Amino acid sequence: DYIQKHLYNKKSISTLITHEYEQLTFIDKDVDGIRNTKFTNEYYQELKRLYLKIKNNSFDLNDLSSTMRLNIAKILYNKPPNVSSQNFINEDNDIKKLESEYLDSKPEVLIVDNLLTPDALKKLQIFCRTANIFKYTHNGGYVGAYLSRGLANEFMLKLSEDLKSTFKNIFNNLKLTQAWIYKYESTKEGVNIHADPAVVNVNFWITPDEANLD
């Protein structure tokens, strides 16, 4: 179950602590104007102690109290992006041409640059930086949030509907059944090459260009 897999596994809890500490440190710098995150200085200082142990390779599961484990699993802040009536999908792209390219390819694969509008992209980036919902770890050293576990909000659902209404000939009457967001450390392995089961699978990256050194 969640507790055993994520809170009592050394690699998993180390990943959670690292993300939790770095995220709360970022929020505390007030870059995105976040208020009322509901974490105490005592909690933050304990996270810092554990984080430093992880960084100098001296962390042990016994360093972590049962109370701290459960606190790390709690969602402290989850304010969704504001929703507007504007399409979140960038219609400056040649939609008809992109649809034809997808439908004519075998297998059906399509690469789109600048999928979102600049405003939608900015809102989604702020949400991913600040929403304290990334409580699930994976073997590649990354954390995730899921539609049924903190990610469901009006912005995400409108984004799904805007995709369908913009690319009508690709999505037709399909419904969104699952969505997730992953965060990766640049020094970890990340996700192996794979294909998820879906009629149409959409993957997009919102990392700022300046963070991409490739």
Where do the model's predicted regions map?
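Fe(II)/2-oxoglutarate oxygenase catalytic core
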Residues: 1-214
